[in-house]
Amino acid sequence: MMKLKSAAVAAAALVASAGVAGAEKMEVTHWWTSGGEAAAVSVFADAVNAAGHEWVDGAIAGGGNARPIILSRIAGGDPMAATQLNTGRDAEDLVQAGLMTDLADLAEAEGWADFIRPSKLLDSCTYEGRIYCVPVNIHSFQWMWLNRDVYAQSGVDVPSNWDEFAAAAPALRDAGFTPLAVGGESWQISGMSGVFQVALGGLDLYRAINVDKSAEAAASPEMTRVFQAIADARGMVDDGYVGRAWNDATAMVITGKAGAQIMGDWAQGEFGVAGQTAGVEYDCLPGLGVYPVLDTGGDAFYFPKPNKNVEAMTAAQLEMASLLVSKQVQVDFNLAKGSLPIRGDIDLEAANGCMKKGLEILANPENVLPSSEQTFSGDTQGQMEDLWVSFFNDPSISVEDAQARYVEIIASAD
């Protein structure tokens, strides 16, 4: 307890030393625009406003659209006070260019390394020993969400793994349902493909490709199975998937138009806003019911160096960073978002069944994988995303040709 009090005092002193922390208008950019996301981001906004500042919302719909806009503004000398990005290498070039506020002294004063878990999250924010972002949650794409009533109406049991799901798909078609709700945005198809890689290829394959960058693993029979599953999934979607937003695909499951969706745990916030309960209206399968694992992606906030009112804005940035990792804000935000907290020292009594599954998985380090955003450069990620999207959208591309291109990408990956 004495250590915690000392850390709090040190952190307060650090914020004060950065400048006079008056009421600042803080423009915050992010891409949280769905119903569940809006409920979650309001937790952060309320905390910033309660601290005496003014949260100026800069929402930009769609992460794929938002990232280049955000990064371009910062690089072009038009910084916002704070911005959401993913944990990983999104802002690597801007950090190296010295355009981000250094949070290392605050992190040390508050003891972030003592309570942020897994430690790799903080590593993703670290460059040359200094910390430039604050992780706010743990998100993983490794989930499937299923509508229980759709399966009941189709006369089949709710699947417990991918093979059962694939076997039940014809029954759902015959009953008038779409077996798999998919959104056609590139990041959705790429993320879904990564889920197949873990669930059907196995943990060793995932690590060999995403960590060791092994072209041999990319050419393996296990990876062939992954490409075949993606090809099979083409036949489980509806004709209207192209261009569909992720939350619209989630709504298909919520409203009983589709049996399931492969999507990250942020989808859980949409079920919550709709008043649905895990284990009652919907079920969840981490790792497609095959490998219950999580990849440690998620969201982080960066604080671009201000170019006016520097001392006061820097103080406000440090105060906001401290708020984002505070215990109550972490609890309230992650319960609304459907994500897991980055703090290992809080009690989520109100967590639902799916969130508890995630917490149990997270408790075993062997079940925690780095996300591809943490291991591959933006260029390599872009090449892989282009391949996944082209393969899913174009049935004329064979499994063999797609895998051959994938091997080339991994062989030259950085």
Regions found by a protein language model. Name each.
Residues 117-120, 282-285, 334-386, 390:
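Long, aromatic- and glycine/proline-rich binding clefts that accommodate carbohydrate-like moieties
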Residues 25, 47-50, 75, 152, ...:
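Conserved C-terminal helix/tail region of periplasmic/extracytoplasmic solute-binding proteins
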Residues 128, 132-136, 142, 166-215:
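Extracytoplasmic/periplasmic solute-binding protein
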Residues 21-97, 109-111, 158, 315, ...:
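Conserved N-terminal structural module of periplasmic/extracytoplasmic solute-binding proteins
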Residues 169, 211-243:
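Glycine-centered hinge/linker elements that transmit conformational signals in sensory
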Residues 24, 46, 50-51, 76, ...:
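Extracytoplasmic/periplasmic substrate-recognition and gating elements
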Residues 88-141, 192, 283:
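Hinge/lid segment of periplasmic solute-binding proteins
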Residues 104-117, 184, 200-225, 273-278, ...:
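Short, solvent-exposed loop/beta-turn-alpha elements that line the ligand-binding surface or hinge
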